[in-house]
Amino acid sequence: MAIHLYKTSTPSTRNGAVDSQVKSNPRNHLIYGQHRCGKGRNARGIITAGHRGGGHKRLYRKIDFRRNEKNIYGRIVTIEYDPNRNAYICLIHYGDGEKKYILHPRGAIIGDTIVSGTEVPIKMGNALPLSDMPLGTAIHNIEITLGKGGQLARAAGAVAKLIAKEGKSATLKLPSGEVRLISKNCSATVGQVGNVGVNQKNLGRAGSKCWLGKRPVVRGVVMNPVDHPHGGGEGRAPIGRKKPATPWGFPALGRRSRKRKKYSDNLILRRRTK
């Protein structure tokens, strides 16, 4: 991803650094509208995910995470921006006339050909079962359940690594550092997700953040005691606790949030490191 730096003409653009413009021209049969009514609230109207609200209207792009077009070659026609994710998407024209969106693999350009199936070449953008991949292959868009479609390593710049195969399972090292077992029959896409430099972006002003549906973040220590456990005190006071807490009083910053005795515990060989 090419980073574009603005000229220092105004305060709002002085620190701005955004990616080069990638246009979006979605196909009508591959998009549909979404009714965004939650804004971070649950069914009872209580805020469960903070700092969300507003934002520009979006049309959802139908992404092909399953890659069901087996042994049919497709050609990358466009590389487009998707407002629903950090990664770019590619429009693929298959030989049988189908047109679908997939996640943009890093390094793929317009005109490249891709294919999915068994015993296909180990080439960037191709999708095939883990059993047909050599050890050390970099992959993304990984299935957890056979036939359900890719669920792991789909964010911009995400990449996992195939480190072992034994019996009916394959061992993967995920982007979070977690090492886990997955069925060798599950499929994945070769390569890394594109738009790697997305974390280098600096929007430069609060208005650009609002367009994305992200509201301001306020520290708990500057609130009143009725609003946050860290609030209150005279002047710049400490939080008054041994450990930081969430607005609802639960331990924050380091507490394990994974459900205990989950069915997949025996599949995780090493917990994530971040």
From Swiss-Prot:
It comes from Glycine max. Part of the 50S ribosomal subunit. Belongs to the universal ribosomal protein uL2 family. NCBIfam families: rplB_bact. HAMAP family: Ribosomal_uL2_B. GO terms for cellular component: chloroplast; mitochondrial large ribosomal subunit. The lineage of its organism: Eukaryota, Viridiplantae, Streptophyta, Embryophyta, Tracheophyta. GO terms for biological process: mitochondrial translation. The gene is rpl2-B. The keyword Ribosomal protein applies. It is found in: Plastid, Chloroplast. This is Large ribosomal subunit protein uL2cy. PANTHER family: LARGE RIBOSOMAL SUBUNIT PROTEIN UL2M, RIBOSOMAL PROTEIN L2. GO terms for molecular function: RNA binding; rRNA binding; structural constituent of ribosome; transferase activity. Keywords: Chloroplast, Plastid, Ribonucleoprotein, Ribosomal protein.
